[in-house]
Swiss-Prot record:
Is an adhesion molecule necessary for normal myelination in the peripheral nervous system. It mediates adhesion between adjacent myelin wraps and ultimately drives myelin compaction. One of its GO terms (biological process) is cell aggregation. Residues 227-249 are annotated as: Disordered. This is Myelin protein P0. The keyword Glycoprotein applies. Residues 1-29 form the signal peptide. The keyword Glycoprotein applies. Residues 30-153 are extracellular. It holds the Pfam family V-set. Coiled coil: none annotated. Residues 30-143 form the Ig-like V-type domain. The gene is MPZ. Keywords: Cell membrane, Disulfide bond, Glycoprotein, Immunoglobulin domain, Membrane, Phosphoprotein, Signal, Transmembrane, Transmembrane helix. It comes from Gallus gallus. It is a single-pass type I membrane protein.
């Protein structure tokens, strides 16, 4: 009897452990995403986007709920609800005539648009999504700032500065490459001219050498001719006295 009771107790503990292990896992909780802050100007419109991630398929019973907490207020009111395939705009608050549903549940999009913004719209908007059976999760909040003029964000200014610096660097690099290209091209032209001049000098020197190689025979012929003429003159001068003697006799 005692052994049977102990065995039944162990079986009960085992069943409890299995049931607890098969319970909902925190890793399967739904995750909702919205931007941290959104800016708008008085009289314009703004889109408050809301998306989510779920481990389950998109359910027919999916629901979106938007709440609004005005700046400086502790109370939060429901301003919009989507369920059973139909959007509902709550009568509470000043958004009834200025709100538009632009979401698409099949694309996990629960965005809304608020038209004709006013300073009273400053505050925090909360988006909550349920996708049965995935209903455990944390909602997401976005803060709306309504101003006379949309301020230039720090990121935009920084991006503009970085873009300007990169553009300046690109221009400097382009100028350097252009100057280098022009310099190399000029050097190539000068090199071709020098090569042509050197080639012309070589050709002229070759012609001069060929002329000089042809001059020695002519000089030798002129020397031989001058020698022959000199010898003939000497013979003539030697023979002239003898003829003179014959004439005297």
């Amino acid at each position: 009897m005692a052994l049977g009771a102990i065995g039944d107790g162990r079986l009960l503990l085992l069943l409890v452990g299995l049931l607890s292990a098969s319970g909902p896992s925190p890793t399967l909780a739904i995750h909702v995403y919205t931007p941290r802050e959104v800016y708008g100007t008085v009289g314009s419109h703004v889109t408050l986007s809301c998306s989510f991630w779920s481990s389950e398929w998109i359910s027919e019973d999916i629901s979106y709920t938007w709440h609004f907490q005005a700046e400086g207020s502790r109370d939060s009111i429901s301003i919009f609800h989507y369920g059973k395939g139909q959007p509902y705009i709550d009568d509470v608050g000043s958004f009834k005539e200025r709100m538009e549903w632009v979401g698409n549940p099949r694309r996990k999009d629960g965005s809304i648009v608020i038209h004709n913004l006013d300073y009273t719209d400053n505050g925090t908007f909360t988006c909550d999504v349920k996708n049965p059976p995935d209903i455990v999760g944390k909602s997401s909040q976005v803060t709306l700032y309504v101003l006379e003029k949309v301020p230039t964000r720090y990121g935009v200014v920084l991006g503009s500065i970085i873009g300007g610096v990169l553009l300046l660097v690109a221009l400097l690099v382009a100028v350097v490459y252009l100057v280098r290209f022009c310099w190399l091209r000029r050097q190539a032209v000068l090199q071709r001219r020098l090569s042509a001049m050197e080639k012309g000098k070589l050709q002229r020197s070759a012609k001069d050498a060929s002329k000089r190689s042809r001059q020695p025979p002519v000089l030798y012929a002129m020397l031989d001719h001058s020698r022959s003429a000199k010898a003939a003159a000497e013979k003539k001068s030697k023979g002239a006295p003898g003829e003179a003697r014959k004439d005297k006799k």
